[in-house]
C-alpha cells in the first residue's frame, strides 16, 4: 500500500508538471484501473485522448476498453477497443482483447474471426489458446478443442490457463 501511495503521488506530480502529458495520464489511468478505481482510470484515459498531439491514442483507447470491461461496462469496452483497432488494425493484443470480449457476449463467429486475425499477426499465447479452446468447445468442435488444449499444455504448462484446463474450469 505504501508503494501504491508513492506511485500515485508520482503520477499526480508528473501530471501537475505537464497537464498535457498523455503518456503519464494513460499510465496513471491503467494504474488506477488495476486497483479497481475504474471511473478515475477512465477519466485519465479521456484526459489523455483530449490532447490532439498525443502520438499513441490507440494505446489509451485499448486501455480504456480493458478498464471498462473490468468495470463491467461491456458496451463502452467494445467501443473503445474498436476505436483503437481503427487506428491500429493489426495490433494483436487489442484483437485478442476484443475477441475475448465478443466471446463473453456470445458472438462466437466474430470471436473466431478475431482469433484468426490474431493468429496471423502473433505467436499463440496462453490467453489466445485458452480462448480458442473455449470457443471450439462452445462450437462443438472437439478435435480443434483438443488441439488447442494440447498446445496450451505443451507451450504454457505453468500458466493459469493450463491450470484451469486441467481442473476443467472452462467458464
Task: List the predicted regions and their residue ranges.
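TPR alpha-solenoid repeat register
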Residues: 24, 31, 58-60, 94, ...
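Structural marker of alpha-solenoid helical repeat scaffolds
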Residues: 17, 51-53, 87, 120-122, ...
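Terminal, low-structured helical/coil segments at or just beyond the last alpha-helical repeat
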Residues: 118-171
